[in-house]
Amino acid sequence: MWIGWIEFDLLLGDVHSLKEKRSILRPIIADLSRRTEAAAAEVDAQDLHRRTVIGVTVVAGSAAHVRGVLDRADRLLAEEHPEITVLSARQGLHSSRD
């Protein structure tokens, strides 16, 4: 079994409240989950208006499949969501045999 994760540090556009932030993030997180078939959630910086951290994780039988899903999530955020700026992305891959 392989477990992979990617964590995105994001800068949001012209956001002035947490309510505005949620209205931007909710569809992005839903899109990530739907199009990558992985779990996605806001995992840090919940109290900041213009910054957030989104995590995506996937469990699969092969490392290649996990890498493919994480790469797809990375491309999706970078190419299809102009309302955000990806400041950094960190990822990890672990085997159940580790």
For the regions a protein language model found, what residue spans apply to each?
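Residue-level preference for alpha-helix termini and adjacent loops
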Residues: D14-S17, E42, D47, E83, ...
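Residue-level signal for beta-strand positions within conserved beta-sheet cores that form or flank
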Residues: T36, T52, P82-T85
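A structural signal for short, well-ordered beta-strand segments
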Residues: I6-L10, I54-V56, A89-Q91
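C-terminal structural segments of small proteins and small subunits
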Residues: A60-D98
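Short, charge-patterned binding micro-sites
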Residues: I3, A40-S62, H94
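N-terminal first-folded block
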Residues: M1-A39
